[in-house]
């Protein structure tokens, strides 16, 4: 779904996509060893945990709620109330305590760990908890002497962080929200690009919900007002969705600044159900689709403008936005 705002100083869009197993039709049984030579792949475990891997990498699917990473870089995301996912590495065991985190195992079998949300437990003997916003390099989790605090840096994990939310690619003036930004998007001021923010996941969008756009094709503003009689924008069946917010929130322009035309493309791994493009609908769906820690009360300028344009591809997996920013 897409929602956005009504002045060039701020855009926001929301996109829900149909939720299904992230195996591209291939199930991996426990004990299966995977070697990835190029690209990225995302695994959805039966427990609900999601593991996004970037090549070059080697890992083994150990059980419905655990894996072993021999080498490479991964992001582990354990959404909602799920806890207990275990990632084994040559340096030792990393246990989820309700979190998302990134791990890179180098050629010397050391594991560099960064916790994005929540917390993890490192090691079985002398276990140590690592909280969000912290990072550690582990050579042997059995010994506290082989654990070293390092600078927290998420940049090397941004590709797998986005993949863990089902994003296949971004092009143009857009970047994916860093860990921590999704809980407070109103605080992110960025004049250089739009921000794509993952919101709630696995949400039931009921039959009869009104959206702004549900059909593929090119749609130009101004977008229709809320109108239940518009059957072309009403969901005909209840659908489980993940939601994304696309926003632009620039710093206050100077007297000499100039607006510009921006084209942005977002590729999503599964079909987009629809797009919300007006403030009234965006506000209506906030309780269901917004991140639970975000409060949009007080924001005035929401929605897309009359000169904005949105194109949804025929396979519903690519959205192109053209905005004045």
Map each language-model feature to its residues.
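Short acidic/polar, Gly/Pro-enriched loop/turn segments located at secondary-structure boundaries
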Residues: 1-155
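Ser/Thr- (and often Asn-) enriched beta-sheet segments in non-cytosolic proteins
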Residues: 21, 35, 42, 60, ...
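Intrinsically disordered, low-complexity regions
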Residues: 26-28, 32, 40, 73, ...
């Amino acid at each position: 779904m897409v929602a956005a705002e009504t002045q060039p100083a701020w855009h926001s869009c929301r996109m829900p996509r149909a939720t299904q197993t992230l195996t591209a039709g291939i199930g991996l049984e426990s004990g299966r060893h995977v070697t990835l030579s190029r690209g990225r792949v995302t695994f959805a475990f039966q427990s609900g945990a999601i593991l996004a891997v970037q090549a070059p990498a080697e890992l083994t699917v150990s059980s419905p709620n655990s894996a072993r990473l021999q080498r490479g870089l991964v992001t582990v995301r354990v959404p909602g109330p799920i806890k207990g996912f275990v990632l084994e590495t040559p340096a030792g065991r990393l246990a989820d305590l309700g979190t998302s985190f990134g791990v890179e195992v180098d050629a010397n079998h050391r594991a560099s760990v960064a916790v994005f949300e929540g917390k993890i437990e490192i090691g079985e003997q002398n276990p140590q908890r690592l909280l969000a916003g912290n990072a550690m390099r582990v050579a042997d989790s059995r010994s506290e002497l082989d654990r070293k605090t390092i600078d927290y840096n998420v940049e090397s994990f941004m590709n797998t962080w986005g993949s863990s939310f089902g994003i296949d690619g971004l092009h143009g003036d857009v970047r994916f929200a860093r860990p921590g930004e999704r809980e407070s998007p109103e605080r992110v001021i960025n004049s250089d690009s739009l921000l794509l923010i993952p919101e709630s996941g696995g949400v039931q969008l009921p039959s009869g919900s009104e959206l702004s756009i549900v059909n593929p094709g090119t749609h130009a503003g101004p977008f229709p007002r809320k109108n239940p009689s518009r059957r072309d924008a009403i969901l005909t069946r209840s659908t489980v969705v993940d939601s994304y917010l696309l926003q632009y929130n620039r710093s206050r322009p100077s007297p000499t600044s100039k607006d510009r035309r921006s084209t942005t493309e977002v590729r999503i791994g599964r079909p987009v159900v629809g797009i919300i493009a007006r403030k009234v609908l965006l506000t209506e769906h906030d309780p269901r689709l917004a991140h639970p820690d975000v409060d949009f009360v007080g924001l005035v300028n929401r929605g897309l403008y009359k000169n904005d344009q949105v194109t949804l591809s025929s396979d519903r997996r690519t959205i192109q936005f053209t905005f004045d920013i």
